[in-house]
Regions:
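Bacterial N-terminal signal peptides that target proteins for export
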Residues: 2-16
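Bacterial N-terminal signal peptides
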Residues: 15-24
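N-terminal leader/linker segments that initiate helical-solenoid repeat arrays
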Residues: 27-68, 72
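Charge-biased low-complexity segments
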Residues: 31, 43, 48, 76, ...
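Hydrophobic face of amphipathic alpha-helices that form TPR/SEL1-like repeat modules
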Residues: 53-60, 88-98, 127-136, 165-169
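Structural signature of tandem alpha-helical TPR/SEL1-like repeats
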Residues: 63-72, 100-113, 139-146
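Helix-start (N-cap) detector for alpha-helical repeat units in TPR-like alpha-solenoids
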Residues: 83-86, 124-126
Length: 311
């Protein structure tokens, strides 16, 4: 069940780090030490079908029946409290999705609910999306609280450029001095209320990966902007973040890739997609699944803004 307390916290629990989280949202099953039982084999077949249905929905390439099946499996998982499914479904509601004749309409309210629940369960990639959603809705207070929460949990802790700096730059000017103090109080209240659960989830995500789980090489990808005279520079002059769902083979190469969300919606993500397609992960020759799924965030950042703290 969706926690009803979030309905009453729209100012604090808003409707909006990155770093080493690419492997944190992986849903690949662990490799068994012995031959699988018939029930385990059937479970793997069902999971592979579910993954294929969800990928069809996210990529927008599939029949209406397949895409609806992908949506229903995401919805069931999200309502059961699966944070990865909540993150994915919330991201899809951000802008809606068309897949064959299946249309998932944009729904800011559902996006905020699912993403907020994913965030408080340690899926920090939900925080930039929630902040961007609140920017779109004209809710500068809420957007800033999500940006501060993102900054608080960012990895490494010293990351004061990129997404949080950009979000704060774009919204702080909309607030009065009193409101600036209020967002700090609200962010602290959010952290105090949910920190134990978030830290526990982050600790679990940091545990040694299983044999089948993709392990990224290095931090998340950042791409320099084009030259200042380019129209793309104007469109994405602050920052762009694209979250991909990627299927890696046993050798660690990308076999399938689909965009979960792009914030802000960048008009030409070709360069970011190339970066994602070239990304390799750890090989797993002994893995009993042909494809290993993972979220991969790719950030475009021109380092235009940096957060400085004045005593």
């Amino acid at each position: 069940m969706i926690d009803p307390i979030l309905h009453g916290m729209r100012r604090i629990l808003l409707a909006g780090t990155l770093a080493a989280l690419a492997a944190a949202a992986v849903a690949a099953p662990p490799a068994p030490a012995t031959a699988p039982t018939p029930a385990e084999s059937a479970g793997r077949v069902a999971k592979a079908q579910k993954d294929a249905d969800q990928f069809a929905l996210i990529s927008g390439r599939g029949s209406a029946q397949v895409c609806k099946a992908g949506f229903e499996s995401l919805r069931r998982g999200a309502l059961r409290g699966n944070a990865v499914d909540q993150l994915t479904l919330g991201a899809l509601y951000l802008h809606g999705r068309v897949c064959g004749r299946f249309h998932l309409a944009r729904d800011d309210h559902k996006a905020s609910l699912y993403l907020a629940h994913a965030a408080i369960q340690g899926r920090l990639l939900a925080m930039p999306a929630l902040a961007e959603l609140d920017v779109r809705r004209g809710r500068a207070l809420e957007a800033n609280v999500w940006a501060l929460a993102y900054l608080h949990y960012a990895v490494p802790k010293q990351q004061n450029t990129g997404c949080p700096a950009s979000l704060l730059h774009r919204t702080l000017g909309m607030l009065s001095a009193a409101q600036n103090k209020q967002i700090v109080r609200d962010a602290n209240a959010f952290i105090l209320r949910y920190n134990a659960g978030i830290e526990a989830a982050l600790h679990q995500q940091a545990q040694p990966p299983t044999a089948c789980r993709p392990r990224p090489v290095g931090a998340h990808s950042r791409v320099p902007l084009l030259q200042p005279f380019s129209r793309i520079h104007i469109v994405a002059m602050h920052r762009a973040l694209v979250l991909y769902l990627v299927a890696y083979d046993r050798d660690g190469r990308v076999q399938k890739l689909a965009t979960v969300f792009a914030e802000p919606r960048w008009r030409d993500a070709r360069r970011l997609r190339q970066i994602a397609e070239q990304r390799r992960v750890s090989a797993a020759p002994a893995c009993d699944t042909a494809l290993r799924w993972a979220f991969l965030p790719v950030e475009l950042d021109n380092h235009k803004y940096r957060i400085s703290h004045r005593g």
